[in-house]
Amino acid sequence: MQAGLCEPWGLGFRPLLRMVVVADHWPRRGYPSRPMAEADWPGAFLTLAEAWAAGDSVGPDRWQAALETVALPPNQDPEPLILLLATPLVLINASPYGHRRASIQAWGQSLGLTSSTLVALDHYVQMVGQGGARGAAGASPGSPLPPSLEDLMTLVTSLQGQVLPTLTLADRWNWPSVTLALVGLLAILRSGPGGLPWPGAMGLDHRGNLGPRWRGYTLAQVDDLADALYGQWAGSSPVSTGNAYNG
């Protein structure tokens, strides 16, 4: 059975946030031999996820402050970064019926996102809400640079949501870690948490923490953050994103 958010796993959002960690530590680009061109996005991801997990709103000022901490390489499209940073909000508002799509679009508009990024955000909301089901079945993957959200979904669909082959191929194409995290999330939403390359297999369980890139977080703290986000999703009302959301 497809593991959509409409039928929550016993592990809640833990596999999803662990997927983000795994993608950032993927072999050949992970700590300690990370290419200098990789954007330092985990700190911004944690800052925003913590705010939403606590029930706080994230308006334009707070969003921009987090975004400004990430220095993207000159040739890297900012759209995947924006989608990844918005992922905690998308998760806690996920619905297979798309009940909150308009609200998230209003939030994106309040941030001044471009029209193309707003379209990508809406597609991403649908993909997450439907458990990664949205995509072009039967399409063949390519190796586009930079990859679009549809390219990510085409890869996931072509490999039937198998996480390890998906990440391996995306890495072979030199997709940046922020894109690996997105494609990994879409794959695990489609196939379920059983396909996650668990951090223990990558040696992450043997570290005291995930290093300064992850603000000294441990995997246990990542799990706690995932549980807090899952609690917001399971609650009676979604987390506010500010006035644009509440309207």
Please name every model-derived segment.
Residues M1-G247:
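Structured, active/binding-site neighborhoods that engage oxygen-rich ligands
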